[in-house]
């Protein structure tokens, strides 16, 4: 094969592999088997090995780097990666909206809601459409350059896709008709969408050819991968990861990108910045998808707070069946101008809030232990605790099952404990916090 023939073949293979990456990670469609896709990658790899001068930084073969890095470089974010305030009830959510309306009464207050992922926030900077820098959030202003590790995540595009003007027109039309679906405005909206799409498309092409686009999102580990990883940790007599966020963070901060690649992380985008002519958060989400960036399909436009609360309840009910962990939803003021006018308080934008699910764990103090006699005469110890609100209910009692469980926990009367009440199961003491002991605690003894 001549170099020119190899060049054409390599181009076609890259396009084919990138197409299937886009269809799988963005549209959740697997059009060919993983084995067939691996075969295409292997063919591309062999060609590039034979013609190394044709290797490009955005080739699918370049996701995994070579030698481990000695250390991570620091990266200053173009704009701070801020945090969010939390609310835990519809009443608190209403209070948040009231404060914002008081601050900016002329604002447009509709909302875009998405899942609050339990992962690691990262920034992806694309220059001329090519992934240039991937960084952790760090302290919000300065993060760490983990570009090589983020490249190993298949869901993250190495080069952004170029959307058509029609695709952009459809996005703008769809976002406008969700706000005002009345037939009387359809003609005006269509004309507006077409005019707007032309401007946005021109700006996107310019940014992809000679500009800068930043995608922010969440690198996360699925439930299945997390469980598999901890099984492997135990086999190697290494400490298991405490939670999926720690696992994702630990995987991203590996100096050897081969280790990161083996952890099988995933990614969802949630924010887009650049001079693109967009007007709403909803449009930004839709455009990310057109650019080849996966977004969480469980994201919804909400006309008012009632719709937000309904979305919150829907996700709460289905959370156990989701392939990832979540502890709430994120509510964003949809209109970009309103969002910007609301500004920032402390380290959190006023236009975004985390609407958390009822906590499934809480701390409380064991006041006494009572022993109940069952029908078969078996004694069951029951902890009487200070009332605590957990998983949507107030809990005062928790079974301790037997003395073996008390001994395993190292529990004493007066101890501060972590109480868990997940789903519909009965409350359970899962951990004692011995460092909070005062010396007044008492040993638990069964009745003689």
Where are these regions (language model features)?
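Compositionally biased non-globular segments, especially hydrophobic aliphatic-rich helices
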Residues: 180-181, 196
């Amino acid at each position: 094969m001549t170099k020119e023939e190899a060049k054409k073949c390599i181009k076609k293979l890259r396009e084919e592999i990138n197409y299937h990456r886009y269809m799988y990670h963005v549209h959740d469609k697997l059009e060919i088997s993983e084995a067939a896709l691996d075969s295409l990658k292997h063919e591309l790899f062999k060609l590039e090995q034979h013609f190394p001068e044709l290797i490009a930084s955005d080739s699918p073969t370049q996701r995994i780097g070579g030698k481990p890095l000695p250390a991570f470089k620091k990266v200053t974010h173009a704009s701070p990666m801020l945090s969010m305030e939390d609310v835990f009830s519809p009443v608190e959510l209403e209070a948040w909206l009231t404060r914002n309306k008081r601050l900016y009464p002329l604002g447009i207050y509709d909302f875009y809601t998405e899942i609050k992922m339990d992962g690691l926030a990262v920034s992806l900077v694309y220059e001329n459409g090519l992934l240039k820098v991937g960084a952790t959030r760090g302290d919000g202003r300065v993060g760490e350059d983990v570009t090589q590790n983020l490249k190993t995540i298949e869901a993250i595009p190495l080069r952004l896709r170029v959307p058509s003007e029609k695709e952009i027109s459809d996005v703008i039309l769809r976002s406008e008709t969700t706000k005002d679906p009345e037939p009387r405005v359809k003609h005006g909206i269509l004309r507006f969408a077409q005019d707007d799409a032309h401007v946005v498309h021109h700006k996107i092409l310019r940014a992809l050819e000679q500009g800068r686009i930043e995608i922010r999102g969440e690198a996360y580990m699925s439930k299945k991968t997390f469980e598999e990883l901890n099984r492997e940790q135990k086999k190697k007599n290494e400490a298991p990861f405490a939670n999926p966020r720690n696992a994702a963070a630990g995987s991203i901060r590996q100096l050897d990108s081969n280790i990161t690649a083996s952890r099988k992380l995933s990614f969802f985008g949630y924010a887009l910045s650049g001079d693109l002519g967009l007007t709403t958060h909803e449009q930004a989400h839709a455009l990310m998808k057109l650019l080849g960036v996966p977004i969480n399909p469980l994201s919804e436009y909400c006309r008012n707070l009632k719709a937000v609360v309904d979305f919150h309840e829907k996700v709460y009910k289905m959370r156990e069946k989701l392939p990832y962990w979540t502890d709430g939803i994120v509510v964003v003021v949809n209109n970009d101008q309103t969002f910007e006018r609301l500004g920032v308080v402390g380290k959190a934008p006023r236009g975004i809030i985390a609407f958390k699910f009822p906590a499934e764990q809480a701390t409380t103090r064991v006041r006494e232990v009572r022993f109940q006699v069952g029908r078969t005469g078996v004694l069951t110890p029951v902890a009487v605790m200070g009332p605590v609100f957990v998983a949507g209910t107030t809990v005062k009692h928790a079974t301790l099952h037997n003395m073996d469980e008390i001994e395993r926990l190292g529990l004493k009367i007066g101890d501060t404990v972590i109480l868990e009440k997940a789903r519909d199961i009965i409350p359970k003491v899962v951990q004692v916090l011995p460092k909070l002991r005062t010396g007044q605690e008492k040993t638990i003894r069964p009745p003689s």
